[in-house]
Amino acid sequence: MYRTLLKSKIHRVKTTHCELHYEGSCAIDEDLLEAANICENEQVHIWNVDNGERFVTYAIKGQRGSGMISVNGSAARRACVGDLLIIAAFAQVAEADVAAHQPQLVFVNDQNRQVELRHHVPTQAL
């Protein structure tokens, strides 16, 4: 049996562009893609912190070091420049490997530059 687990997350990045008439996808600064272990054309789930929208698209490379997060195509209707997004990717993990699985969790500053990398989500407490 396989389980679908969080593989990668880029937490609270700021939308820098919305390109309605681009053919689709989400362009992500190549530095962030590498840090999160997300490859070009990989399916990503995007959750808009500001308006609650959730959508699925695929990642493409944005200019390295630019901080670019460009929501493109019809998905551009689901975000505005300045909106905070969480970008996640998932993987199928064999049951035997679940306990050892560690996601890549990338945290950024307000210029979308990586400031922290973690490999677990802390337990939520009251």
From Swiss-Prot:
Is synthesized initially as an inactive proenzyme, which is activated by self-cleavage at a specific serine bond to produce a beta-subunit with a hydroxyl group at its C-terminus and an alpha-subunit with a pyruvoyl group at its N-terminus. It is an enzyme of class 4 (lyase). SUPFAM superfamilies: ADC-like. Catalyzes the pyruvoyl-dependent decarboxylation of aspartate to produce beta-alanine. Its EC number is 4.1.1.11. This is Aspartate 1-decarboxylase. Keywords: Autocatalytic cleavage, Cytoplasm, Decarboxylase, Lyase, Pantothenate biosynthesis, Pyruvate, Schiff base, Zymogen. One of its GO terms (molecular function) is aspartate 1-decarboxylase activity. The active site is at residues 25, 58. Its main location: cytoplasm. It comes from Acidovorax ebreus (strain TPSY) (Diaphorobacter sp. (strain TPSY)).
